[in-house]
Amino acid sequence: MSRLTILLVVLVMATFSSPLRSQERKLEPVDEATRDLSWAHFKNRLLDAVMKRDRKFVLGILDRNVRIGVDGVRGVDEFRKQWHLDADDSPLWRDLPSALFLGAAYMKREGRPRELCAPYLLAQWPRSMDPHAYGAIIAKDALVKAAPSSDSPTLATLSYDIVPVADWEVADKAPDFPQKWTRVKLKTGEGYVPEEQIRSPIEQVACFVKTESGWRMTAFAPAGG
């Protein structure tokens, strides 16, 4: 075997055994209920209700034991109270659409019926990746900046990558600019992506079940409750 051949073999083995390479994971977007016309109709109706601040509709589609948090808090009254649903600036009006727009995936957990959960990240998350330490880029060609500013140099471009997160919310360098950034770890150091282009799998997750009377929301909670 020639020296050149040996060198090539060593390089190939190093490439595939590199810890950095083994850490590269992607989470492509999915929407597993696209062929279910009843879901498409329901989701559009729910988004329309949220846009119009239609509290009656939102409360009407809640399961009576709807999950609100990971601490076991449940019920329609608690949902209304914890989400400040009677306020025009309820965070629900912002957070629920951001979850639904990303697509949904089915998941089955012990003691619960099969649920359709949005966004898809929690249901599709690799078990080998710590959901508390990583986030998933939810955009194609997201620019990673050297500093929390759109004017700073671009370090990399990411598309649906799972990346380690150092800080979930960093203010823009411009004091009065509302853009928030997330500090992520790269092979070569750290960089910043707009916070709307990355998401944690344990952020607010909305889960639904299909019943004889239609779709019901069973949870809107961190990690789906």
Residues covered by each model-derived region:
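Short, well-ordered alpha-helical segments enriched in acidic and aromatic residues
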Residues: D54-N65
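Hydrophobic helical h-region of N-terminal Sec-dependent signal peptides
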Residues: L7-M13
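SH3/SH3-like beta-barrel superfamily modules
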Residues: T157-Q197
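Bacterial N-terminal signal peptides that target proteins for export
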Residues: M1-L7
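Short, low-complexity N-terminal intrinsically disordered segments enriched in polar/charged residues
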Residues: S22-D48, G60
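Surface-exposed, charged secondary-structure patches
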Residues: V70-A156, V170, Q179
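Long, low-complexity intrinsically disordered regions
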Residues: V205-G225
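N-terminal signal peptide c-region/cleavage motif recognized by signal peptidases
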Residues: S17-S18
